[in-house]
Amino acid sequence: MSDIESIVEKLSSLTLIQAAELSKRLEEEWGVSASAPVAAVAPAVXXDVAVAEKTEFEVFLESFDAKSKISVIKEVRSITDLGLKEAKELVEALLKSLRTGVSKDEANELKKKLEAAGATISLR
């Protein structure tokens, strides 16, 4: 039996506690770490490749000022073409998407209108 086969056989017979102790002792003896290496970040690709900018956004109603609830409902109705009851339910539910798949400019315009009415809006 070769030395390597002998070592493999002995290591295979170790218990988990013994293997952990062996690992710790070898780290101390050799000055190395058994932890997984950290992945390096890939270098940036040449400047010819443009970074893809997000083109479609989703407008979310995060919260609203209680005093301006009616204004927010009116604005939601005008944006979504919902009826009064549906718009009220949507506003009261919070954290709901008001519009999806809108352009950046349209999303920012909707955000301005809703914030002027007293809502807190996020774009995703």
Curated annotation (Swiss-Prot):
The keyword Secreted does not apply. The keyword Metal-binding does not apply. GO terms for molecular function: mRNA binding; structural constituent of ribosome. CDD domains: Ribosomal_L7_L12. It comes from the Bacteria. GO terms for cellular component: cytoplasm; ribonucleoprotein complex; ribosome. Gene3D superfamilies: 3.30.1390.10, Single helix bin (1.20.5.710). It holds the Pfam family Ribosomal_L12. PANTHER family: 39S RIBOSOMAL PROTEIN L12 (PTHR45987), LARGE RIBOSOMAL SUBUNIT PROTEIN BL12M (PTHR45987:SF4). NCBIfam families: L12 (TIGR00855). Belongs to the bacterial ribosomal protein bL12 family. This is Large ribosomal subunit protein bL12. It comes from Liberibacter africanus subsp. capensis. The lineage of its organism: Bacteria, Pseudomonadati, Pseudomonadota, Alphaproteobacteria, Hyphomicrobiales.
